[in-house]
């Protein structure tokens, strides 16, 4: 018999390399065939419900790494709750209406103007469903578990019907109105936009300082006086109706040398302006307060129109002249100013951003950006332009087309936020936020939010269920809206475009505003944020196994102005409360330099490629390791690093499996009271680790959980317990108490880790589970254990923590001895340890083989005051001296012992190994051992 055959070398077929790209897909197929998600739901019937409601991604294009981070984070929570005593169904959703899908069809050569609306809408639907199928495959391949065969889509008939009923609640409460107001207008999309559909970029604008001659100075200013007006949008000057001044500003009347005109500017800006305009020598001839200018009129610089001077607090002295050109059809402030002074709301520009003939000669047919130059030229021709200069400032863009937008007054439908603002703010108080600053952010957004423009001039979406009577009166009655909802539930929203208005109204419907029984219908559709914002009614309130409000919404931080926001508004209107009990927000995924990922930059990471090259588990572990509450930088190098951490976890599982392969939990388990002290210590540590991990999971703090996990695996297991375990597990007799004691804890660690990590690494833990003799077919169908406490554990931990401090000194001295070439491996060392009486008592109280715990061949303990001068001294009074151990190396345990060969039958073994072999392999006493 060989020496090797007398050892209990761990054995397992669990592979060191996971071959994840191949094995994960096979395992996912197995889950699907065995309906593991459905089995888990069945197991949890009757338990408390936890619902994470999925914010629907847009059904267009491939998933990106941000999608992966979001969906995997949700999967962590749903899987964890499912294994922790909750019924946690997960219904994935998709946002399937909207402009990008229309654009995709246009790019593919379809012209919506050359086909019927229903034909075009059918093509949109077909495209959206294909995108859903594609994204669903990708999400499933990330290991995300859920109702993939029964998701929610905003184009579903039932969802559209629910959305119409939500609209009905707004109508019933008088929160809808139609008005001609300036809205964000996207000429590239030919539609109004909501705030959530706008992003800001820095642009360089052409600004103009120009003059308007006083026409009626109210006896205070003469006709040879000119107001110096400033604008950042010269193309809007043809629509100018007024000049706004601040009532509290002091204004100077200035007469520059070599100019017979007098100019009015804000006194605080005079010095800066004089420098810009080259007024080296000027005289201030008068002062007046802004409020004195109110009611004066000026002459438009190049059109035959009188302009009013009015008061506005929004005029600042940060830039310009303190006098602002005002066009009520082109901005919120201008609009409110216009309403205050009863000015025309005038926006002479078409849907494509092209100016119309109402702007005057030279402007008709000119694109608004080109019209800047036309306007500047006209100002110059009329001797009204004092200065033109560039200005860099933040400007709104269409978030989908990436083109700049304009403010334009058009007839739109609005939701009055003002009427219910306080109710919405009150509802926020009942919500818990992660991170906590989310509350302030959402609160401020609601506080500052203007009325919500919900109409869109597009075709692929849910129609506004509004009818018009013969005299133009809008009809939004409960009866008509409910009837439309019923039609949508039966036929889908296409019915709106297929039928005449009279065929969409309830049978026999009459209205006093239509004496002839004639009606028309609205042609605009709803903002897609109204679609997804209605999901609490279309999904949570519709499916009886879900709950409303949901327990949790988890999305990117941009959703404070998007889905969190629109869902909150609609929910408060429908039910008087928020649709969620908790919100978790995440940052964006950026490249390694902190730049936004974009195809044009070539810095996009495709999660599908990472899956194909490394496996979904690597992405999942990365998500756990990332601080997702802020923006996350990621590169392929990040995944390489995570692969190393994964390899460490995998090898930990392999070591635990190998060294429990001959352990039967039912027969070999040692009770806590009978465990060796070091094993008790590790069992207590394991349960403290489990408690912390569960707390982190409960708080959705997966980053901290990752740190706790890596610390436990690297320090408690790899660097200590698994390191010292080899001597016990390999060397001691197979059935010895000390070995079974350690295996008991090993198995507990294995069982805890495999269950605890299933929400994070389900492919790997299911693979590990297949090598364990547990009754359940899938680890996903088990429960994560609750942490246990043990009698006297605090005292035990205190002792062992003190010992670990002593051990750290010994390890440091051993490292120095290795560096000095005094020893090679630690097993070549003898350690002389010099301790105080308290420290010696500590070691004795552990009742352990301290030499084994230190990993050396010989240990001698002495009083602290006997420490020689060349010993390593440590602050707590410990001294350590490392020398080369005397004796020969035992062929079995590899320790250097003076008693090697003391048993003549085993000349190559130390006394300890000889006794173990003689007792367990008696035949070798005569035959001897081979190397």
Swiss-Prot record:
Name of this chain's protein: Isoleucine--tRNA ligase
Taxonomy of the source species:
Bacteria, Bacillati, Bacillota, Bacilli, Lactobacillales
Keyword Transcription regulation tagged:
no
Q: Which PROSITE patterns match?
A: AA_TRNA_LIGASE_I (PS00178)
Q: Where in the cell is it found?
A: Cytoplasm
Protein source organism: Limosilactobacillus reuteri subsp. reuteri (strain JCM 1112)
Instruction: Give the record's GO biological process terms.
Output: isoleucyl-tRNA aminoacylation
Broadest EC class assigned to this enzyme? ligase
Q: Does the keyword Aminoacyl-tRNA synthetase apply?
A: yes
Instruction: Give the main localization category.
Output: cytoplasm
Q: Name one GO cellular component term.
A: cytosol
Keywords, alphabetical: Aminoacyl-tRNA synthetase, ATP-binding, Cytoplasm, Ligase, Metal-binding, Nucleotide-binding, Protein biosynthesis, Zinc
> Which Pfam families does this chain map to?
Anticodon_1, tRNA-synt_1, zf-FPG_IleRS
Positions annotated to bind Zn(2+): 890, 893, 910, 913
* Domain of life (superkingdom): Bacteria
């Amino acid at each position: 018999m060989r020496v090797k055959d007398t050892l209990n070398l761990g054995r397992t077929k669990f592979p060191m390399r996971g071959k994840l790209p191949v094995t994960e897909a096979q395992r996912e197929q197995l889950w699907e065939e065995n309906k593991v998600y459905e089995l888990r739901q069945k197991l949890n019937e009757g338990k408390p419900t936890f619902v994470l409601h999925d914010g629907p991604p847009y059904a267009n294009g491939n998933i990106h790494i941000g999608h992966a981070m979001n969906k995997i984070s949700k999967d962590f929570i749903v899987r964890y709750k499912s294994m922790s005593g909750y019924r946690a169904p997960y219904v994935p959703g998709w946002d399937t209406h909207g402009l990008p899908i229309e654009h995709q069809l246009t790019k593919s050569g379809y012209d919506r103007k050359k086909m019927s609306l229903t034909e075009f809408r059918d093509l949109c639907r077909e495209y959206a469903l294909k995108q859903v199928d594609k994204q669903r495959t990708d999400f499933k391949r990330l290991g995300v578990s859920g109702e993939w065969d029964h998701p929610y889509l905003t184009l579903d008939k039932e969802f559209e019907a629910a959305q119409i009923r939500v609209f009905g609640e707004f109508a019933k409460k008088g929160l809808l109105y139609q008005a001609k107001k300036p809205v964000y207008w996207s000429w590239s999309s030919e539609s109004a936009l909501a705030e959530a559909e706008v992003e800001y970029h820095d642009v360089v604008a052409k600004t103009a300082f120009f003059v308007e001659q006083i026409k009626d100075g109210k006896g205070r200013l003469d006709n040879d006086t000119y107001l110096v007006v400033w604008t950042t949008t010269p193309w809007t000057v043809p629509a100018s109706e007024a000049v706004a001044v601040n009532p509290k500003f002091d204004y100077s009347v200035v007469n520059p040398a070599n100019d017979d005109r007098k100019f009015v500017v804000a006194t605080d800006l005079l010095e800066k302006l004089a420098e810009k305009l080259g007024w080296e020598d000027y005289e201030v001839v008068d002062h007046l307060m802004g409020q004195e200018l109110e009611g004066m009129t000026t002459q438009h610089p190049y059109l035959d129109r009188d302009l009013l001077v009015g008061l506005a607090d929004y005029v600042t002295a940060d830039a310009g002249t303190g006098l602002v050109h005002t066009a009520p059809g082109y901005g919120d402030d201008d609009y409110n100013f216009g309403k205050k002074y009863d000015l025309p709301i005038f926006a002479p520009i078409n849907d494509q951003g092209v100016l119309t003939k109402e702007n005057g000669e030279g402007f008709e047919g000119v694109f608004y950006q080109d019209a800047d130059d036309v306007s500047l030229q006209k100002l110059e021709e009329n001797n009204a332009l004092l200065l033109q200069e560039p200005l860099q400032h933040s400007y709104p863009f269409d978030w989908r087309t990436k083109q700049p937008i304009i403010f334009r007054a058009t007839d739109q439908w609005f939701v009055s936020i003002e009427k219910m603002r306080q109710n919405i703010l009150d509802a926020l108080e009942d919500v818990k936020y992660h991170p906590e600053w989310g509350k302030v952010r959402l609160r401020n957004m609601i506080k500052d939010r203007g009325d919500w423009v919900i109409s869109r001039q597009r075709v692929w979406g849910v129609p506004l269920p509004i009818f018009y009577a013969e005299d133009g009166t809008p009809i939004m009655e409960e009866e008509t809206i409910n009837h439309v909802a019923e039609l949508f539930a039966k036929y889908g929203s296409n019915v709106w475009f297929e039928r005449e208005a009279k065929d969409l109204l309830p049978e026999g419907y009459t209205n006093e505003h239509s004496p002839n029984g004639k009606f028309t219908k609205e042609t605009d559709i709803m903002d897609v944020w109204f679609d997804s914002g209605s999901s609490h009614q279309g999904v949570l309130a519709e499916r009886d196994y879900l709950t409303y409000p949901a327990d949790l919404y988890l999305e990117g931080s941009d959703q404070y102005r998007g889905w969190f926001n629109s869902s909150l508004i609609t929910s408060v209107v429908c039910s008087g409360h928020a649709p969620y009990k908790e919100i978790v927000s995440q940052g964006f995924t950026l490249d390694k330099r902190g730049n936004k990922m974009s195809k044009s930059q070539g810095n996009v990471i495709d999660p599908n490629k990472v899956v194909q090259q490394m496996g979904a588990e690597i992405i999942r572990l990365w998500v756990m390791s990332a601080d997702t509450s802020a923006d996350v930088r990621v590169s392929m190098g990040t995944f390489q690093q995570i692969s190393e951490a994964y390899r460490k976890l995998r090898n930990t599982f392999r070591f635990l499996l190998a060294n429990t392969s001959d352990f039967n939990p039912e027969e070999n388990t040692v009770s806590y009271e009978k465990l060796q002290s070091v094993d008790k210590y590790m069992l207590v540590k394991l349960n403290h680790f489990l408690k912390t991990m569960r707390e982190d999971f409960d708080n959705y703090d997966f980053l901290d959980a990752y740190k706790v996990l890596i610390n436990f695996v690297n320090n408690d297991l790899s660097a200590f317990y698994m390191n010292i375990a080899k001597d016990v597990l390999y060397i001691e007799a197979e059935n010895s108490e000390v070995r079974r004691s350690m295996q008991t804890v090993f198995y507990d660690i294995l069982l805890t880790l495999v269950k605890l990590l299933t929400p994070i690494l389900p492919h790997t833990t299911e693979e590990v589970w297949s090598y364990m003799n547990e009754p359940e077919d899938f680890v996903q169908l088990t429960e994560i254990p609750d942490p246990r406490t043990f009698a006297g554990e605090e005292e035990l931990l205190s002792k062992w923590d003190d010992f670990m401090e002593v051990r750290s000194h010994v390890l440091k001295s051993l490292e120095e001895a290795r560096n000095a070439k005094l020893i090679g491996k630690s097993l070549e060392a003898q350690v002389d340890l010099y301790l105080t009486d308290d420290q010696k008592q500590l070691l004795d109280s552990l009742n352990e083989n301290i030499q084994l715990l230190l990993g050396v061949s010989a240990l001698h303990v002495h009083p602290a005051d006997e420490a020689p001068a060349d010993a390593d001294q440590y602050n707590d009074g410990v001294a350590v001296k490392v020398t080369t151990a005397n004796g020969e190396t035992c062929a079995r345990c590899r320790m250097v012992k003076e008693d090697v060969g003391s048993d003549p039958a085993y000349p190559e073994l130390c006394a300890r190994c000889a006794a173990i072999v003689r007792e367990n392999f008696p035949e070798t006493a005569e035959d001897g051992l081979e190397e």
